[in-house]
């Protein structure tokens, strides 16, 4: 392999160690409104009768699932400041990003999911988001839900994801009107930062002191300005460009 190959491998190992400790690529997905509901489920079960023989009977159970609703609007504002970390003779560029998510949810359309309102468990409603790594967070995360503050706890309830944060809304009554939200995040990362256009209308604005950005993903910026001291970029994306629904059950 030779000396050059060894040097490249050593550099890769050093960079991997730095980014593993600091934070790797950041993917921010959400927020999503989740509301549990109960439903009846019929199944066949074996029942042992008093005389010892087994009969197969239909039984009805009450189960609980979640209905998920995406926002009507989502605005993402992020300031990612970079720095260089060292491991021996090797360097790695990393960033610390302050991210603010704001927007609104429309009243959940349970009828479109064929869910009866009497089966909705409003007190167990929650807002959740997925994030690759929240190790950069130095203070407790807070959700502002129409003026009410709710603490975000570690862990995502979004199907398919585990890392992130979730806030229990503990609603006393059904959501009757549009609900505005805001969440502030403080994250470490390296390599890149990605956001999912989860709303009907999505806007994102990212600024950084990194002078040589590369724009990847399914949507390129609608506006960008790259300078020697950093860059600014903006996106506007509608839900027509995505391949997942506005609501679903799981």
Report each predicted region and the residues it spans.
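Soluble non-transmembrane domains of integral membrane proteins
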Residues: 9, 13, 20-21, 30, ...
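Membrane-proximal extracellular/periplasmic loop immediately following the first transmembrane helix
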Residues: 37-46
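Hydrophobic alpha-helical transmembrane signal-anchor segments
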Residues: 1-2, 6
